[in-house]
Amino acid sequence: MANTYTSLHYHVIFSTKNREPWITPDIEARVWRFIGGIARKHAMTALQIGGVEDHLHALVTAPPILAPSQIAQILKGESSKWIHREFQLKGFSWQDGYGAFTVSTSNVPQVISYIQNQREHHRRKTFQEEYLEFLQASGIKYDERYLWG
């Protein structure tokens, strides 16, 4: 082939350290916007970013040179520095790990809706329940002793 064509959508999920409620409603819109800017700066497209006080969901389209681990590292690292600087949240940090799940183009609208409705969704389900469902639906083997750090 003369050219390379990709369609790489990732649903990335990570929480605040110890799932502390740092991303309060008064700062969340700014945090989500800033993370969208980080994505753009690194040749990604943030299709939807959202979450609740203790975790984030980001649906991004990424170039093939970025591995999921790099995507998580970039989003977490740059946003953490900015959150410390912008809001003086000295104890804030993201958890060490993350989840990254591929999304087919045909499922992008459903994932966007899912992320937009996080607040409603978490009236019925905890982050831990939600995350376990993602792992199970994706067929990812895990040991629960090492999930929550």
Residue ranges and their predicted role:
Residues 1-149:
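Basic nucleic-acid-binding interfaces
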